[in-house]
Amino acid sequence: MTNIRKTHPLLKIVNHSFIDLPTPSNISAWWNFGSLLGFCLIIQILTGLFLAMHYTSDTMTAFSSVTHICRDVNYGWLIRYMHANGASMFFICLFLHVGRGLYYGSYTYFETWNIGIILLFTVMATAFMGYVLPWGQMSFWGATVITNLLSAIPYIGTDLVEWIWGGFSVDKATLTRFFAFHFILPFIVAALAMVHLLFLHETGSNNPSGLISESDKVPFHPYFTIKDILGALIFGLMFTTLILFAPDLLGDPDNYTPANPLNTPPHIKPEWYFLFAYAILRSIPNKLGGVLALVFSILILVLFPILHLSKQRSMMFRPLSQCVFWILVADLLTLTWIGGQPVEHPFITIGQLASIIYFTIILIILPTTSLLENKLLKW
């Protein structure tokens, strides 16, 4: 008798995705982040659901409702901190997942890569809207500054901003619609993640060597289910440590002050995971130029398959490209640091230099290094 998991219409899909899936035998721990991102999404949807049961999306009561969750709801403080820090863990996993894709040449799977970029944008939009909901000072001013960037779009900009706000400033209408979108977007993310997996399973996973692995594949279960569970346990340990020992480490103290449209905080800045893009935005004195640089700083990922000029897929055997890659990582960390600093003397120049280096590495240095390595192969 054939096993039910191979015949049942629903179980068959699960079987082909997580049990009998042929997987390259040499994929390293860098391939754990896909499952960890799924884990993060489940945590965020569940904690968000319980928070939404007690939250009110009204400018008068939003801040108080979050306080009420933390003080009066059973384990409300835990749910709130899981949700807030869950977003940070989500982005850590996202950045590592994208970095892995860049290092090992996974972007040559066009469809999977492009769906991944759409996923990244969707998660960023979700996180931004979620940051507005507690209606603290940084929530309000962050929403005002970031939505205002759309006014840089010629001709329709101002109308577009007022349309998004639902009025002439960030107010009740804005908060209500942001709550509605913040609630629905994670489910769209989940649907997109399934499409992402669908395209991935059409080609099979990449592996560290970047070579075709048809001749050396093992079933996903038990080998990689165990590996993913270990990854989830390590993730859980780090996550619980963060929540229980330093829950406010990655947050902004200004957000513990209720939103006040009459009082602007001295340094308006987004959450830490947007700081690199914020630094690129600020490094250009022109408003429209800054907005374009901000969007292109992430949209540039689309160009990686086109800019891949190397004869080898992975960077595993390309020491020069490895060097350039790690300089890019250091540059992104520099941009993150600059994004959190005030707009004054040394930081402005450092930010501008780091922004130039970021685009130069991706558009010029990496492709040139690839061509040089191709020459060295013949030498």
UniProtKB/Swiss-Prot annotation:
GO terms for biological process: mitochondrial electron transport, ubiquinol to cytochrome c. Binds 2 heme b groups non-covalently. It is a multi-pass membrane protein. The chain crosses the membrane at residues 33-53, 77-98, 113-133, 178-198, 226-246, 288-308, 320-340, 347-367. Its cofactor is heme b. One of its GO terms (molecular function) is metal ion binding. GO terms for cellular component: mitochondrial inner membrane; respiratory chain complex III. Gene3D superfamilies: Cytochrome Bc1 Complex, Chain C. Pfam families: Cytochrom_B_C (PF00032), Cytochrome_B (PF00033). A ubiquinone binds at H201. It comes from the Eukaryota. Heme b b566 binds at H97, H196. Keywords: Electron transport, Heme, Iron, Membrane, Metal-binding, Mitochondrion, Mitochondrion inner membrane, Respiratory chain, Transmembrane, Transmembrane helix, Transport, Ubiquinone. Heme b b562 binds at H83, H182. InterPro entries: Cyt_b/b6_C, Cyt_b/b6_C_sf, Cyt_b/b6_N, Cytb/b6-like_sf, Cytochrome_b, Cytochrome_b_C_euk/bac, Cytochrome_b_N_euk/bac, Di-haem_cyt_TM. Its main location: mitochondrion. It is found in: Mitochondrion inner membrane. Heme 1 (or BL or b562) is low-potential and absorbs at about 562 nm, and heme 2 (or BH or b566) is high-potential and absorbs at about 566 nm. Belongs to the cytochrome b family. The cytochrome bc1 complex contains 11 subunits: 3 respiratory subunits (MT-CYB, CYC1 and UQCRFS1), 2 core proteins (UQCRC1 and UQCRC2) and 6 low-molecular weight proteins (UQCRH/QCR6, UQCRB/QCR7, UQCRQ/QCR8, UQCR10/QCR9, UQCR11/QCR10 and a cleavage product of UQCRFS1). This cytochrome bc1 complex then forms a dimer. Component of the ubiquinol-cytochrome c reductase complex (complex III or cytochrome b-c1 complex) that is part of the mitochondrial respiratory chain. The b-c1 complex mediates electron transfer from ubiquinol to cytochrome c. Contributes to the generation of a proton gradient across the mitochondrial membrane that is then used for ATP synthesis. This is Cytochrome b. It comes from Belomys pearsonii (Hairy-footed flying squirrel).
